[in-house]
């Protein structure tokens, strides 16, 4: 069943030469927890780019159906579509990813007034998208490339790193690492796809159009500058050409109202190919080091970038990623902690029979919670959020240990009260000759029955020990009043009682020692498992970083080779230097990666190893036990 359309919502608008983010759009993005594929469509006014947006949004109409600048303030518009349908809808929770469409108001619109508006909207589209679609008319020629002068200003509008390059060099590798794929769509294409009399594909047409043209003419230099920037910043390129939607002049005048079957079949075929490519190959928005952006993460990015622009700064990827990491890692801590609490509550039946039973469940739930955090966190500098999680899990584990003790204490006390009720109700009947033996028989039966009660928990011995201590004065009174016993027999009985009490106290202390040993062994095992989880994550991040750098190296090497073959030695040499530096960085990552990981792991182990206050308290119990053993 087709879901109802969701109207486009303005994401970024320009009021009085000041960009602002629409909070309604941010609230919608915040609800999208899946990774997002972000497609931005940019082009000059009245070039038909809205039709492309409609193709992706599932509207079978031609340009004009999306709001124009007369109806919406200038800026980006967003719509969300799931990957399974072309209807513009909220992304369902079960979808693995969501599609976010960013439609810009037309570039060069004189009604917008602010000349910088186009520059910033162009830059934001590049920063936010994973696929950047540039739409133009007729052909890719000098004029079309001159109109794309915005791409030559990206290095002035965007920074990759918080600290500038120490040599002041604008390194294209910094941008290649996070720039989107580039798709050029040409509407009302007027040429045949031929080169030197041979048929060529639209992609080959684009690559030929991006070849540098010899000459010092200012127009040639301007178009060459755009060509070079596209080739260096956007190594993944694709092109689609669209012939006229219809050759009927009267129908062209009514493009907004004609039906789909009145469109030229070749035009419809191109539109379907474009939409199919986007839905099949458009990638999830990914930042450096393989960080996948979710809907709520996209909202954080756009807010951070717009805040930077409004403050007079240049949007910086590193700063945005840091802001995003702070938010996402904080959420990851809460997700992991909630998972731990939910799973502990589901799997535990308090009181547990032994402390080991609780520790086993805790270990399993903690391991899962750590995995949840590792999955949803990134760039956790100095493991500050992981430390918060560990402290939170320790606190929660302590609460479960306390609840377990309280449940055991309550249950044991209730059972002991039930079993000893007859004894306590008839205590006066033992003040007779031979009463001490009768009292001891009944108490021994209580003890026997008590230890037959299942799942008393960790407080079973302590509760019974307290019961015996509460009976000590009563037993002594009954013993002294028993005229059937001689003074010597009473002394022997009293000595036996004290010895038995001392032995039970020793048993209780040994039990606490055993529980402490189990706790410490379980903690050590968990620490090793947590350390291994952290090691895997650090190594995966390093491998991803090396993989990303190798991909950049491959793309830049290919582009450098092309420049060299075309005879452009200056551009080839610039890329050679960048390739050399990138190769050096990869070599350093491989050589120093292990030592860096080990350094982080050592620091982490020193954090998780120190004994807690509760462990110190247990140590004092051990000290007391050793003293008693020496007596």
Curated annotation (Swiss-Prot):
Location in the cell: Golgi apparatus membrane; Cytoplasm; Nucleus; Cytoplasm, Perinuclear region
GO terms assigned for molecular function: GTP binding; GTPase activity; ubiquitin-protein transferase inhibitor activity
Induction: Up-regulated in response to Sendai virus (SeV) infection.
InterPro entries tied to this protein: G_GB1_RHD3_dom (IPR030386), GBP_C (IPR037684), Guanylate-bd/ATL_C (IPR003191), Guanylate-bd_C_sf (IPR036543), Guanylate-bd_N (IPR015894), P-loop_NTPase (IPR027417)
Chief localization: Golgi
Catalytic activity entry: GTP + H2O = GDP + phosphate + H(+)
Protein's UniProt keywords contain Lyase: no
Keyword Repressor: no
GO cellular component terms, semicolon-separated: Golgi membrane; nucleus; perinuclear region of cytoplasm
UniProt keyword list: Coiled coil, Cytoplasm, Golgi apparatus, GTP-binding, Hydrolase, Immunity, Innate immunity, Membrane, Nucleotide-binding, Nucleus
EC code: 3.6.5.-
Disulphide bridges, residue numbers: none
Assembly, per entry: Heterodimer with other family members, including GBP1, GBP2 and GBP5. Dimerization regulates subcellular location. Interacts with IRF7; preventing interaction between TRAF6 and IRF7, resulting in impaired TRAF6-mediated IRF7 ubiquitination.
Function text: Interferon (IFN)-inducible GTPase that plays important roles in innate immunity against a diverse range of bacterial, viral and protozoan pathogens. Negatively regulates the antiviral response by inhibiting activation of IRF7 transcription factor.
PANTHER family per the UniProt record, alphabetical: GUANYLATE BINDING PROTEIN
Protein name (record): Guanylate-binding protein 4
Species, as recorded: Mus musculus
Lineage: Eukaryota, Metazoa, Chordata, Craniata, Vertebrata
């Amino acid at each position: 069943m087709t879901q109802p359309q969701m109207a486009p919502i303005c994401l970024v608008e320009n009021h009085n030469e000041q960009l602002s983010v629409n909070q309604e759009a941010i609230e919608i993005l915040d609800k999208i927890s899946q990774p997002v594929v972000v497609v931005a469509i940019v082009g000059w006014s009245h070039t038909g780019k809205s039709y492309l947006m409609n193709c992706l949004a599932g509207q079978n109409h031609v340009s004009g159906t999306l709001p124009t600048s007369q109806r919406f303030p200038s800026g980006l518009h967003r719509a969300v579509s799931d990957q399974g349908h072309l209807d513009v809808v909220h992304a369902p929770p079960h979808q693995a990813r969501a599609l976010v469409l960013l439609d810009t108001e037309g570039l060069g619109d004189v009604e917008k007034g602010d000349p910088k508006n186009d520059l910033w909207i162009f830059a934001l589209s590049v920063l936010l998208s994973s696929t950047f679609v540039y739409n133009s008319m007729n052909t890719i020629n000098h004029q079309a490339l001159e109109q794309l002068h915005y791409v030559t200003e990206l290095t002035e509008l965007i920074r990759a790193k918080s600290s500038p390059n120490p040599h002041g060099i604008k390194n294209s590798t910094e941008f290649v690492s996070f720039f989107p794929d580039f798709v050029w769509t040409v509407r009302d294409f007027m040429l045949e796809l031929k080169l030197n009399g041979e048929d060529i594909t639209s992609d080959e047409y684009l690559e030929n159009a991006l070849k540098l043209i010899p000459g010092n003419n200012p127009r040639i230099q301007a178009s060459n500058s755009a060509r070079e920037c596209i080739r260096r910043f956007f190594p993944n390129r694709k092109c689609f050409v669209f012939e006229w939607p219809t050759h009927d002049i009267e129908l062209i005048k009514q493009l907004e109202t004609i039906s789909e079957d009145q469109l030229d079949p070749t035009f419809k075929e191109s539109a379907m190919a474009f939409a199919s490519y986007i839905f099949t190959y458009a990638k999830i928005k990914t930042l450096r080091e393989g960080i996948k952006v979710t809907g709520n993460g996209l909202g954080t990015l756009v807010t951070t970038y717009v805040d930077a622009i409004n403050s007079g700064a240049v949007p910086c990827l590193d700063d945005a990623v840091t802001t995003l990491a702070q938010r996402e890692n904080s959420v990851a801590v809460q997700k992991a902690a909630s998972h731990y609490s939910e799973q502990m509550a589901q799997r535990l039946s308090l009181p547990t029979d032994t402390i080991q039973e609780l520790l086993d469940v805790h270990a399993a739930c903690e391991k899962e919670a750590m995995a949840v955090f590792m999955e949803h966190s990134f760039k956790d500098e100095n493991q500050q959020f992981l430390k918060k999680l560990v402290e939170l899990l320790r606190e929660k584990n302590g609460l479960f240990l306390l609840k377990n003790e309280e449940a055991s204490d309550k249950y044991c006390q209730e059972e002991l009260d039930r079993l000893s009720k007859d004894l306590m109700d008839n205590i006066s009947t033992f003040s007779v000759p031979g009463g001490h033996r009768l009292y001891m028989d009944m108490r021994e039966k209580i003890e026997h029955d008590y230890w037959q009660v299942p799942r008393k928990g960790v407080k079973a011995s302590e509760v019974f020990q307290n019961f015996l201590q509460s009976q000590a004065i009563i037993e002594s009174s009954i013993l002294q009043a028993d005229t059937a016993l001689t003074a010597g027999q009473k002394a022997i009985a009293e000595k036996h009682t004290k010895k038995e009490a001392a032995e039970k106290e020793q048993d209780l202390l040994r039990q606490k020692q055993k529980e402490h040993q189990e706790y410490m062994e379980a903690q050590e095992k968990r620490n090793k498992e947590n350390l291994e989880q952290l090691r895997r994550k650090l190594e995966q991040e390093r491998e991803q970083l090396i993989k990303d750098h190798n991909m950049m190296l491959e793309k830049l090497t290919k582009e450098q080779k092309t420049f060299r073959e075309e005879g452009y030695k200056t551009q080839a040499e610039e890329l050679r230097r960048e390739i050399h530096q990138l190769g050096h960085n990869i070599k350093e990552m491989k050589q120093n990666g292990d030592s860096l990981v080990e350094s982080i792991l050592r620091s982490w182990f020193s954090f998780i190893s120190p004994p807690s206050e509760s462990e110190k308290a247990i140590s004092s119990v051990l000290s007391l036990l050793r003293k008693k053993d020496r007596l």
